[in-house]
Each structure stands twice: as C-alpha cells, then as structure tokens.
Amino acid sequence: MNKIYFVIVFVACFCLFAEAQLTFTSSWGGGKRSGVAPMSCKNEEAVATIFKLIQNEAERFIICQQKS
C-alpha cells in the first residue's frame, strides 16, 4: 500500500517538474546574471596544498608499513 502512495507522489512531483520545463522560455532576454565568481586561491596554491596532502599520506603509509 505504501508503495502505491510513493509511486503516486513521485509521479505527481515529476508532472510538476515537467510542467515547469514546458512553461520555460529562452526569449526573456538577458536579465540579471552574475558573472563567474573569482577563485579564492591561486592554482599554484591549490597544487601545493594537494601535493602536501599526498606527501603526508605517503609518510603515514610508510610509517604503517614499518610497524607491520
């Protein structure tokens, strides 16, 4: 019985989303669109952080292997 209710609710929600897609039009003009947000860190900083993380994990892995 719960399965039937779930299917009915799912289909109803799906119909609402489908209706929203049908009423959408691309001819509304430009409108207000925000530009792409600037990155908060430089690419070099991100690469350095990832490298340091990998290096730390490699050191932990070596320590664990030495204990075994």
From Swiss-Prot:
Residues forming coiled coils: none
UniProt cross-references to Pfam families, sorted A to Z: Adipokin_hormo (PF06377)
Single GO biological process annotation from the record: neuropeptide signaling pathway
Full protein name: Adipokinetic prohormone type 1
Entry's localization field: Secreted
Positions annotated as propeptide: 34-68
Keyword list, A-Z: Amidation, Cleavage on pair of basic residues, Hormone, Neuropeptide, Pyrrolidone carboxylic acid, Secreted, Signal
Statement: the UniProt record of this protein carries the keyword Secreted: yes
Function: This hormone, released from cells in the corpora cardiaca, causes release of diglycerides from the fat body and stimulation of muscles to use these diglycerides as an energy source during energy-demanding processes.
Signal peptide: 1-20
Homology family: Belongs to the AKH/HRTH/RPCH family.
InterPro entries for this protein: Adipokinetic_hormone_CS, AKH/RPCH_hormone
Tissue and organ expression note: Expressed in antennal lobe (AL), corpora cardiaca (CC), corpora allata (CA) and gnathal ganglion (GNG) (at protein level). Expression in CC and CA detected in all animals, expression in GNG in some animals and in AL in few animals (at protein level).
GO annotations of cellular component type: extracellular region
